Amino acid sequence: MSVEHSPVDPSAEPPEKAEEAALRPGALAEFGGQQRVADQLGLVLAASKSRGTTPDHVLLSGPPGLGKTTLAMIIASEMSAPIRISSGPAIQHAGDLAAILSSLVPGEVFFLDEIHRMSKPAEEMLYLAMEDFRVDVVVGKGPGATAIPIEIPPFTLVGATTRAGLLPGPLRDRFGFTAQLDYYEVADLERIVTRSAGVIGVELAEGAAHTIASRSRGTPRIANRLLRRVRDWADVHHESPVTPQGAETALDLYEVDPLGLDRLDRAVLHAVCLKFGGGPVGLSTLAISVGEEPQTVEEVAEPFLVRLGFLMRTPRGRVPTDRAWRHLGLEPPPDSSGEGLF
């Protein structure tokens, strides 16, 4: 079983990135959901504009698909500034970072995705650049090596991470504004789906946006992906406007159930409940039983199942809750470890 093209995988596939860009809002006022973060960030940007200064460095953390890249682009747009985009894995040497920083123009926004994956030497160079707008380039080797300071123009670093706990304290402390993005409410996702439908030219009947939003796992990227799959179905079946029943039929075809569970999620639940009699079962054994890599099970399926209250991670292994048994149409056994917890 492969989830590489699962419609509810929160990571973006390369072909999707151009489609995502077309659906991104260009201003904070258009950014759906995350109202607290949008209000706080709006205040930071407005104050910077009134003072004529560059905004503080910004750290955005949270699961994939919640809008970190979109917010970075909005920051640049709101400040009428250019944006430079890179990622932690692409910066493995201090020289790579020095080349980028030394070519920034005043006020430019530097978006560094997956900042937690940057190399240690580059990370240490970034400390000085963020604080003093300077980088020290070492020339020569051994005892004769000399550090040459290079001034860089004021810039705003926007760092994005899905694993904020991996960032060292000295790096986190240099961000003037930090925000944790949360999963979206269905009502917010409905507004996002409605807006995106207008952008890509899909007419939705009343209730269709809710059908899509409720299966989107609280994630805008997934909501927009499901909308595109519904559009495909509607084009082939000549349905316009798309009704809630039509959207439901399309998403059933892609094996996304009303809670947003896909084939892998259900396979994990079946394995834990039926193959292993309610567990506990270890990750490696569970992965083998569903035909997936342990990392895929741990990073794609389990977080959502835990968030729904269907699965517990215990020191002895994975255990289903009573809700998981009932979702499969089964009564939990009398000695169920998840009895009464959810």
UniProtKB/Swiss-Prot annotation:
Signal peptide: none annotated. Residues 1-21 are annotated as: Disordered. GO terms for molecular function: ATP binding; ATP hydrolysis activity; four-way junction DNA binding; four-way junction helicase activity. Residues 258-342 are annotated as: Head domain (RuvB-H). It is found in: Cytoplasm. One of its GO terms (biological process) is DNA repair. The keyword Iron does not apply. Gene3D superfamilies: 1.10.8.60, P-loop containing nucleotide triphosphate hydrolases (3.40.50.300), Winged helix-like DNA-binding domain superfamily/Winged helix DNA-binding domain (1.10.10.10). ATP binds at residues 23-24, 65, 68-70, 131-133, 174, 184, 221. Its EC number is 3.6.4.-. The keyword Cytoplasm applies. InterPro entries: AAA+_ATPase, AAA_lid_4, DNA_helicase_Holl-junc_RuvB, P-loop_NTPase, RuvB-like_N, RuvB_C, WH-like_DNA-bd_sf, WH_DNA-bd_sf. SUPFAM superfamilies: P-loop containing nucleoside triphosphate hydrolases (SSF52540), Winged helix' DNA-binding domain (SSF46785). Keywords: ATP-binding, Cytoplasm, DNA damage, DNA recombination, DNA repair, DNA-binding, Hydrolase, Nucleotide-binding. Residues 185-255 are annotated as: Small ATPAse domain (RuvB-S). Belongs to the RuvB family. HAMAP family: DNA_HJ_migration_RuvB. Homohexamer. Forms an RuvA(8)-RuvB(12)-Holliday junction (HJ) complex. HJ DNA is sandwiched between 2 RuvA tetramers; dsDNA enters through RuvA and exits via RuvB. An RuvB hexamer assembles on each DNA strand where it exits the tetramer. Each RuvB hexamer is contacted by two RuvA subunits (via domain III) on 2 adjacent RuvB subunits; this complex drives branch migration. In the full resolvosome a probable DNA-RuvA(4)-RuvB(12)-RuvC(2) complex forms which resolves the HJ. Has 3 domains, the large (RuvB-L) and small ATPase (RuvB-S) domains and the C-terminal head (RuvB-H) domain. The head domain binds DNA, while the ATPase domains jointly bind ATP, ADP or are empty depending on the state of the subunit in the translocation cycle. During a single DNA translocation step the structure of each domain remains the same, but their relative positions change. This is Holliday junction branch migration complex subunit RuvB. It comes from Cutibacterium acnes (strain DSM 16379 / KPA171202) (Propionibacterium acnes). The gene is ruvB.
